[in-house]
Amino acid sequence: MNKILFTAVEARVVGCLLEKQVTTPDQYPMSLNGVVTACNQKSNREPVMSLTDSEVQNTLDMLVKKHQLTALNTGSRVVKYEQRFCNSTFGQMKLSAAEVAIIANLLLRGAQTPGELRIRCARIHDFADMTEVEQTLERLAQHEHGQLVVRLAREPGKRESRYMHLLSGEVDESSRADGHHPDDHRGDLEGRIAQLEQQVATLQRQIAQLLNNGEVK
Protein backbone atom coordinates (compact mmCIF):
# COMPACT_ATOMS: atom_id res chain seq x y z
CA MET A 1 0.00 0.00 0.00
CA ASN A 2 1.16 3.56 -0.70
CA LYS A 3 2.26 5.69 2.25
CA ILE A 4 0.26 8.79 1.32
CA LEU A 5 -2.75 9.49 3.52
CA PHE A 6 -4.85 12.56 2.81
CA THR A 7 -7.68 13.98 4.87
CA ALA A 8 -10.87 14.80 2.97
CA VAL A 9 -9.85 18.44 2.61
CA GLU A 10 -6.29 17.55 1.61
CA ALA A 11 -7.66 15.21 -1.05
CA ARG A 12 -9.87 18.02 -2.36
CA VAL A 13 -6.95 20.48 -2.51
CA VAL A 14 -4.60 18.07 -4.30
CA GLY A 15 -7.36 17.05 -6.70
CA CYS A 16 -8.01 20.70 -7.55
CA LEU A 17 -4.35 21.40 -8.21
CA LEU A 18 -4.04 18.33 -10.44
CA GLU A 19 -7.15 19.38 -12.36
CA LYS A 20 -6.32 23.07 -12.76
CA GLN A 21 -2.71 22.36 -13.74
CA VAL A 22 -4.10 20.86 -16.95
CA THR A 23 -7.38 22.70 -17.53
CA THR A 24 -6.27 26.27 -16.66
CA PRO A 25 -2.47 26.31 -17.00
CA ASP A 26 -2.44 30.13 -17.25
CA GLN A 27 -3.74 30.28 -13.65
CA TYR A 28 -1.27 27.71 -12.32
CA PRO A 29 0.49 27.68 -9.84
CA MET A 30 -2.52 28.74 -7.78
CA SER A 31 -3.05 31.38 -5.13
CA LEU A 32 -4.97 30.78 -1.90
CA ASN A 33 -8.04 32.46 -3.39
CA GLY A 34 -7.79 30.30 -6.49
CA VAL A 35 -7.57 27.11 -4.45
CA VAL A 36 -10.52 28.12 -2.25
CA THR A 37 -12.66 28.82 -5.32
CA ALA A 38 -11.65 25.51 -6.92
CA CYS A 39 -12.36 23.55 -3.74
CA ASN A 40 -15.82 25.07 -3.29
CA GLN A 41 -17.03 25.02 -6.89
CA LYS A 42 -20.30 23.20 -7.40
CA SER A 43 -19.50 21.44 -10.68
CA ASN A 44 -17.46 18.22 -10.71
CA ARG A 45 -17.27 18.08 -6.90
CA GLU A 46 -18.73 15.46 -4.58
CA PRO A 47 -19.50 16.43 -1.92
CA VAL A 48 -19.80 20.18 -2.49
CA MET A 49 -17.76 21.93 0.21
CA SER A 50 -17.85 25.41 1.75
CA LEU A 51 -14.29 25.75 3.01
CA THR A 52 -13.06 29.00 4.55
CA ASP A 53 -9.82 30.74 3.63
CA SER A 54 -8.29 29.73 6.96
CA GLU A 55 -9.26 26.07 6.52
CA VAL A 56 -7.70 25.95 3.08
CA GLN A 57 -4.60 27.86 4.22
CA ASN A 58 -4.06 25.41 7.08
CA THR A 59 -4.45 22.53 4.63
CA LEU A 60 -1.99 24.07 2.19
CA ASP A 61 0.53 24.52 4.99
CA MET A 62 0.11 20.90 6.08
CA LEU A 63 0.53 19.62 2.52
CA VAL A 64 3.73 21.65 2.17
CA LYS A 65 5.01 19.96 5.34
CA LYS A 66 4.05 16.58 3.87
CA HIS A 67 6.06 17.47 0.73
CA GLN A 68 2.95 17.19 -1.44
CA LEU A 69 2.93 20.90 -2.38
CA THR A 70 5.48 23.64 -2.95
CA ALA A 71 4.84 27.24 -1.84
CA LEU A 72 6.30 29.70 -4.35
CA ASN A 73 7.26 33.27 -3.50
CA THR A 74 7.25 34.82 -6.96
CA GLY A 75 8.29 38.30 -5.88
CA SER A 76 4.74 39.49 -5.37
CA ARG A 77 2.89 39.49 -2.07
CA VAL A 78 0.75 36.56 -3.18
CA VAL A 79 2.12 33.08 -2.44
CA LYS A 80 1.32 30.50 -5.10
CA TYR A 81 1.12 26.75 -4.75
CA GLU A 82 1.96 23.86 -7.07
CA GLN A 83 1.49 20.17 -6.47
CA ARG A 84 4.38 17.79 -5.83
CA PHE A 85 2.18 14.71 -5.63
CA CYS A 86 3.28 13.44 -9.03
CA ASN A 87 5.48 14.27 -12.02
CA SER A 88 7.39 16.95 -10.11
CA THR A 89 11.12 17.62 -10.09
CA PHE A 90 11.51 16.45 -6.50
CA GLY A 91 8.80 13.78 -6.31
CA GLN A 92 9.16 10.10 -7.14
CA MET A 93 5.58 9.39 -8.22
CA LYS A 94 5.29 9.34 -12.00
CA LEU A 95 1.85 9.15 -13.61
CA SER A 96 0.70 9.30 -17.21
CA ALA A 97 -1.83 11.91 -18.33
CA ALA A 98 -4.54 9.24 -18.22
CA GLU A 99 -3.58 8.20 -14.70
CA VAL A 100 -3.51 11.83 -13.51
CA ALA A 101 -7.00 12.35 -14.90
CA ILE A 102 -8.43 9.37 -13.04
CA ILE A 103 -6.68 10.13 -9.75
CA ALA A 104 -7.76 13.78 -9.89
CA ASN A 105 -11.40 12.86 -10.51
CA LEU A 106 -11.44 10.22 -7.77
CA LEU A 107 -10.00 12.79 -5.35
CA LEU A 108 -12.63 15.34 -6.40
CA ARG A 109 -15.71 13.13 -6.65
CA GLY A 110 -15.03 9.91 -4.78
CA ALA A 111 -15.94 6.44 -6.06
CA GLN A 112 -17.02 6.25 -9.72
CA THR A 113 -17.58 3.69 -12.44
CA PRO A 114 -15.26 3.44 -15.47
CA GLY A 115 -18.04 4.90 -17.62
CA GLU A 116 -18.43 7.91 -15.33
CA LEU A 117 -14.67 8.41 -15.22
CA ARG A 118 -14.39 8.40 -19.01
CA ILE A 119 -16.94 11.21 -19.27
CA ARG A 120 -15.73 13.28 -16.32
CA CYS A 121 -12.03 13.00 -17.16
CA ALA A 122 -12.51 14.44 -20.66
CA ARG A 123 -11.27 17.93 -19.73
CA ILE A 124 -8.01 16.48 -18.38
CA HIS A 125 -7.54 13.49 -20.70
CA ASP A 126 -9.67 12.29 -23.59
CA PHE A 127 -9.84 8.50 -23.31
CA ALA A 128 -10.06 6.77 -26.68
CA ASP A 129 -12.42 4.08 -25.40
CA MET A 130 -13.47 2.11 -22.33
CA THR A 131 -10.58 -0.28 -22.80
CA GLU A 132 -8.12 2.55 -22.16
CA VAL A 133 -10.01 3.54 -19.00
CA GLU A 134 -9.96 -0.03 -17.68
CA GLN A 135 -6.28 -0.50 -18.53
CA THR A 136 -5.43 2.75 -16.73
CA LEU A 137 -7.36 1.66 -13.64
CA GLU A 138 -5.51 -1.66 -13.71
CA ARG A 139 -2.14 0.11 -13.83
CA LEU A 140 -3.12 2.30 -10.89
CA ALA A 141 -4.20 -0.78 -8.95
CA GLN A 142 -0.73 -2.29 -9.50
CA HIS A 143 1.38 0.86 -9.33
CA GLU A 144 5.03 0.53 -8.34
CA HIS A 145 4.51 2.95 -5.44
CA GLY A 146 1.70 0.84 -4.07
CA GLN A 147 -1.94 0.23 -4.92
CA LEU A 148 -3.57 3.59 -5.68
CA VAL A 149 -7.11 2.47 -6.54
CA VAL A 150 -9.42 -0.40 -5.62
CA ARG A 151 -12.47 -1.88 -7.31
CA LEU A 152 -15.54 -1.82 -5.08
CA ALA A 153 -18.35 -4.32 -4.89
CA ARG A 154 -21.00 -3.71 -7.54
CA GLU A 155 -24.07 -2.00 -6.13
CA PRO A 156 -27.48 -3.67 -6.59
CA GLY A 157 -29.00 -2.78 -9.95
CA LYS A 158 -25.73 -1.34 -11.31
CA ARG A 159 -24.01 -2.67 -14.43
CA GLU A 160 -20.51 -1.51 -13.47
CA SER A 161 -18.41 -1.67 -10.33
CA ARG A 162 -17.09 1.61 -8.97
CA TYR A 163 -13.44 2.39 -8.26
CA MET A 164 -12.06 4.41 -5.36
CA HIS A 165 -8.63 5.87 -4.63
CA LEU A 166 -6.64 4.63 -1.63
CA LEU A 167 -4.93 7.96 -0.91
CA SER A 168 -7.06 8.49 2.20
CA GLY A 169 -6.51 4.98 3.57
CA GLU A 170 -8.07 1.59 3.06
CA VAL A 171 -11.66 1.36 1.87
CA ASP A 172 -14.22 -0.37 4.12
CA GLU A 173 -13.79 -4.12 3.58
CA SER A 174 -17.55 -4.54 3.05
CA SER A 175 -17.23 -2.38 -0.08
CA ARG A 176 -14.41 -4.33 -1.72
CA ALA A 177 -15.17 -6.47 -4.74
CA ASP A 178 -13.67 -9.62 -3.26
CA GLY A 179 -16.88 -11.55 -2.81
CA HIS A 180 -16.65 -11.56 0.99
CA HIS A 181 -18.91 -9.09 2.73
CA PRO A 182 -19.82 -8.96 6.44
CA ASP A 183 -23.50 -8.41 5.57
CA ASP A 184 -23.50 -11.61 3.51
CA HIS A 185 -22.03 -13.60 6.41
CA ARG A 186 -24.49 -12.05 8.86
CA GLY A 187 -27.38 -12.94 6.59
CA ASP A 188 -26.16 -16.54 6.36
CA LEU A 189 -25.83 -16.78 10.15
CA GLU A 190 -29.26 -15.30 10.76
CA GLY A 191 -30.79 -17.77 8.33
CA ARG A 192 -28.99 -20.68 9.98
CA ILE A 193 -30.10 -19.57 13.46
CA ALA A 194 -33.72 -19.30 12.32
CA GLN A 195 -33.49 -22.80 10.84
CA LEU A 196 -32.07 -24.22 14.08
CA GLU A 197 -34.75 -22.48 16.15
CA GLN A 198 -37.41 -24.04 13.95
CA GLN A 199 -35.84 -27.48 14.37
CA VAL A 200 -35.73 -27.06 18.16
CA ALA A 201 -39.38 -26.00 18.23
CA THR A 202 -40.33 -29.06 16.15
CA LEU A 203 -38.41 -31.39 18.48
CA GLN A 204 -40.06 -29.82 21.53
CA ARG A 205 -43.52 -30.40 20.05
CA GLN A 206 -42.66 -34.01 19.23
CA ILE A 207 -41.40 -34.64 22.78
CA ALA A 208 -44.52 -33.02 24.24
CA GLN A 209 -46.73 -35.28 22.10
CA LEU A 210 -44.81 -38.37 23.19
CA LEU A 211 -45.19 -37.38 26.84
CA ASN A 212 -48.90 -36.78 26.44
CA ASN A 213 -49.32 -40.17 24.77
CA GLY A 214 -47.42 -41.88 27.55
CA GLU A 215 -44.82 -43.18 25.18
CA VAL A 216 -41.95 -41.70 27.21
CA LYS A 217 -41.48 -42.96 30.80
Swiss-Prot record:
Residues 169-188 are annotated as: Disordered. SUPFAM superfamilies: Winged helix' DNA-binding domain. InterPro entries: DUF480, WH-like_DNA-bd_sf, WH_DNA-bd_sf. Coiled coil: none annotated. Residues 173-188 have a biased composition (Basic and acidic residues). It comes from the Bacteria. Disulfide bonds: none annotated. HAMAP family: UPF0502. Belongs to the UPF0502 family. This is UPF0502 protein ETA_20480.
